[in-house]
Amino acid sequence: MRHRKSGRKLNRNSSHRQAMFRNMAVSLLEHEAIKTTLPKAKELRRVAEPLITLAKEDSVANRRLAFDRTRSKEMVGKLFNELGPRYQERPGGYIRILKMGFRAGDNAPMAYVELVDRPELVDADEE
């Protein structure tokens, strides 16, 4: 029976799934927006949001936990210096998932995952 077993398998073994979500979380935090399939996007929320919550309180222990989960020194720096202070007043819900139709090749439902309250990029044409 499958009672109370949360999370999606996504046809991968556990180490592959863990590595995939670690990489996706780092990409999302680095670029602040990524495009992926809808089930992966919904599962990514469970990985990325706790990292931002962790970054709201800067301590050596929290930085080490974040490094353990991302394996990227640059991302730990960005989390604690930029993203943590940005979301200090927000009690969760740091990620927005927008549905964006279906992929051409296999008709998989696609989604655009972005951080809320991210700074808008200004085009050079508008200046």
From Swiss-Prot:
Which Pfam families does the record cross-reference, listed alphabetically? Ribosomal_L17 (PF01196)
Q: Which GO terms describe its biological process?
A: translation
GO CC terms, sorted? cytosolic large ribosomal subunit
Q: Does the keyword Ribosomal protein apply?
A: yes
- Keywords on this record? Ribonucleoprotein, Ribosomal protein
Q: Which InterPro entries match?
A: Ribosomal_bL17, Ribosomal_bL17_CS, Ribosomal_bL17_sf
Q: Which residues cross the membrane?
A: none
Q: Which GO terms describe its molecular function?
A: structural constituent of ribosome
The answer to whether UniProt assigns keyword Calcium to this entry is: no
The UniProt similarity line reads:
Belongs to the bacterial ribosomal protein bL17 family.
Q: How does it assemble?
A: Part of the 50S ribosomal subunit. Contacts protein L32.
Q: Which PANTHER family match?
A: LARGE RIBOSOMAL SUBUNIT PROTEIN BL17M, RIBOSOMAL PROTEIN L17
What name does this protein carry?
Large ribosomal subunit protein bL17
Give the lineage: Bacteria, Pseudomonadati, Pseudomonadota, Gammaproteobacteria, Oceanospirillales
